[in-house]
Design a protein with these regions (language model features):
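N-terminal leader segment of winged-helix/HTH proteins
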Residues: 1-41, 45
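Short glycine/proline-centered loop/turn elements that form peptide/ligand docking sites
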Residues: 60-62, 79-81, 98-102, 120-122
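Short, cationic-aromatic polyanion-contact patches
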Residues: 65, 82, 109, 114-138
Length: 158
């Protein structure tokens, strides 16, 4: 796929950037800043990684159900998401991470303790927003970008 992207760069890359800009704009409006969004994205990524250990299905609707279930009940994992790890993954200072995690906790997105680290723990309303608005838009827009790739590949082979 990398070679395909290199050979079709001009025809494809602006679609990728459009996807990224649209997603980032919506995320910045939601979380208030680039740093907050980047930190939240790492927290959601960690939650998805832990969730995959419990997932039996690959279907989005069933994954959303499991997402909601684990957000309410929590999950057993040895994987602890620390300020240090978030800092390492985002290149933000630990103090910046700490401040933003505190804001996310105040806004009912996460829970933090020294023992358990940062855990995705949204309010019902926040979870509904993620599942019914934010992720729906992400999936739709990513699908549209992948359609562009698929059409370009078909054009090349026809």
């Amino acid at each position: 796929m990398e070679i395909f992207l290199q050979q079709n760069f001009v025809a494809i890359w602006h679609h990728f950037l459009s996807f990224e800009i649209s997603r980032s704009k919506f995320a910045l409006e939601t979380w208030g800043s680039g740093n907050a969004y980047l930190i939240f994205q790492v927290i959601a990524w960690h939650h998805i990684l832990v969730m995959t250990d419990h997932a039996e299905s690959k279907i989005r609707d069933e994954a959303i159900d499991l997402w909601f279930q684990l957000s309410k009940t929590g999950f057993k994992t040895r994987s602890v998401l620390t300020y240090s790890l978030i800092s390492s993954l985002t290149s933000l200072s630990i103090e910046t991470v700490r401040r933003h995690v505190k804001k996310l906790e105040e806004n009912n997105w996460v829970f933090y303790s020294k023992k358990e680290g940062v855990k995705f723990s949204p309010s019902h309303e926040n979870n509904m927003f993620l599942a019914d608005d934010f992720n729906v838009k992400e999936v739709r827009d990513l699908g549209r970008f992948l359609d562009v790739l698929e059409k370009r590949k078909q054009k090349k082979f026809n």
